[in-house]
Amino acid sequence: MKILFIGPNNGTSNHNYLSIKNLNKNTDFLNTNYFNKNRIFKFFQWHTNLKIFNHQINLFYKNNVKKDYDIIFFNNVPEIIKKSILEIKKKTKKIFFFCGDNPFTNRDKFRWKNFKEIIPFIDLIIFHIEGRKKYIKKFNIKKYLITVPPYYKEVHFNNVRKIKKKEVVFIGTWFPERGKFFYELKKKGLNFDIYGNKWNKDKKYYKYLKENIKKALNYKETAKIISKYKINIGLLSKGNDDNITRRCIEIPATGSLLCCERTKFLKLILKENKEAIYFSSADECYKKCVYLLKNENRIKNISINGNIKVRKKLNLEAKNIFKKILNFNLIKSKKKLIIRY
């Protein structure tokens, strides 16, 4: 089977490519970082529309997709237009689109505007957030898979630490509701560190949180930092309408304790108080963190249980998830399928 993987050559995209390449050696890579290097392109992509770049986008695919493939696999690529996708369909039996973001909300402004136009021409859309189900009927998506965010063996297994010297951490980008959340935790007396982008944009709470905020991390650094802390706080993106995130799987995969906002779906994946800790408010999060830090055996037991659930019982390693995706039979299957765990 011949596969063309299209996506940026960094972060989770690169690890997704390596997972597919491991399953299917005859896999080529088309790097879309070409677009990300152009600041003017990025500005128009986020703040207006890409119509003035349509010729450039189409030329990129015309010059780089010349061979025939069994599957052309897009990895969360917003830089695609209808004209290009119609030309690409001539080169493949199937077009798969792995959608890591939420292209149906306004959080990323105009970045995903073109995606809605190409939906009818994609053979299979893969969502790794269960909450995307609500958009499937609305946008008339005929063929889709819903799975769970993967972890990467080569990243997360290499960073499992038995001894964790630091206490509480949050790793993530700033959003307005997050500044208030951590201000409440600090006001109550909880000690924590924050790693991530854009926290200095919080005009109201940054001055109170400045000493807690560390640098932004790349993907491999993220796994190392997760492994150093006893408790990793997980917050869902309100603008992205999430009910689970990649971090919810990565934290237990790295052997640390997940303390996350409570959702019905998360409780199905990781049992509350046995494999993860959940909260519905800053006050509940504070109380649970204080209790756990006084009872480190509980932290250890829950961390171990969560790690076993993600790694052994559910087997959420990327290679296993992509194997299910590549083996998905578009002809014999029903119009929709959810990979259940």
Regions from the language model: what does each represent?
Residues M1-Y61, Y69, N75-S84, N106, ...:
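Nucleotide-sugar donor-binding catalytic core of glycosyltransferases
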Residues Y61-K66, Y291:
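Short amphipathic alpha-helix with an adjacent loop that forms part of the alpha/beta core around
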Residues F74-N76, I88-I95:
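Short, conserved structural micro-motifs that define repeat-unit consensus positions
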Residues F96-K109:
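A short, histidine- and acid-enriched strand-loop-helix "catalytic/donor-clamping" loop
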Residues A276-A282, Y291-E296:
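Conserved acidic donor-binding segment of nucleotide-sugar-dependent glycosyltransferases
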Residues R298-K312:
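A short, well-ordered alpha-helix in the C-terminal region of glycosyltransferases
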Residues N315-Y341:
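C-terminal alpha-helical cap of glycosyltransferases
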